[in-house]
Swiss-Prot record:
It comes from the Bacteria. Keywords: Ribonucleoprotein, Ribosomal protein. It comes from Lacticaseibacillus paracasei (strain ATCC 334 / BCRC 17002 / CCUG 31169 / CIP 107868 / KCTC 3260 / NRRL B-441) (Lactobacillus paracasei). It holds the Pfam family Ribosomal_L13. Part of the 50S ribosomal subunit. Gene3D superfamilies: Ribosomal protein L13. GO terms for molecular function: mRNA binding; structural constituent of ribosome. This is Large ribosomal subunit protein uL13. The gene is rplM.
Length: 148
C-alpha cells in the first residue's frame, strides 16, 4: 500500500523566477503568480507546507487593466478609528504605486486565515521598472503568456 507524499520544510528547493508584466492583464498575472508562490506548479505540493518559489515581477507600471477597472475598481481599507474607511481607485494606484496594486491583487489570491499565506506573500518582489536587485540569485525568466 502506498502512502501519500508529504513535503517537509527542510527538503524544499526554491527557485527564483522573473516575470515581465508588460501588457498582461492584472488578474491573469496575479493568478499565475499566486499559484507559483503557493507551489502548486510542483509535484511535491502540500497544502499545509510552504512549497512555493520566489517571484520577481518587473515592469508593473506597464500592466493592463481591462474594461473599466481603472475607474470602477476600488480597494477599501479601514484605519480602525471611527470614520476611518479609506479607498483607493485602481487607476490611481497604477499611476502612483503600481507595485502596491500587484501586491493587493496577489495577496487576495493567497490563503489569508493563517500564517502560511503571509510566508508565501513574503516571497513576492514587485518593481515598477526594469531593474531589480536580485541578480545574485540568478532568477530564470518565466514567460507566462503560454500559462494564461
Amino acid at each position: 500500500m502506498r502512502t501519500t507524499f508529504l513535503a517537509k520544510p527542510g527538503e524544499i528547493e526554491r527557485k527564483w523566477y522573473v516575470v515581465d508584466a508588460t501588457d498582461i492583464p492584472l488578474g491573469r498575472l496575479s493568478s499565475v503568480v499566486a499559484s507559483i508562490l503557493r507551489g502548486k506548479n510542483k509535484p511535491q505540493f502540500t497544502p499545509n507546507v510552504d512549497t512555493g518559489d520566489n517571484v520577481i515581477i518587473i515592469n508593473a507600471s506597464k500592466l493592463k487593466l481591462t474594461g473599466k477597472k481603472a475607474s470602477d475598481k476600488i480597494y477599501y481599507h479601514h484605519s480602525q478609528h471611527p470614520g476611518g474607511l479609506k479607498h483607493e481607485i485602481a487607476g490611481d494606484l497604477l499611476r502612483d504605486n503600481p507595485a502596491r496594486l500587484v501586491e493587493y491583487s496577489v495577496k487576495k489570491m493567497l490563503p489569508t486565515k493563517n500564517t502560511l499565506g503571509h510566508q508565501q506573500f513574503l516571497k513576492l518582489h514587485v518593481y515598477a521598472g526594469e531593474e531589480h536587485p536580485h541578480l545574485a540569485q540568478k532568477p530564470e525568466v518565466l514567460d507566462i503568456s503560454n500559462l494564461i
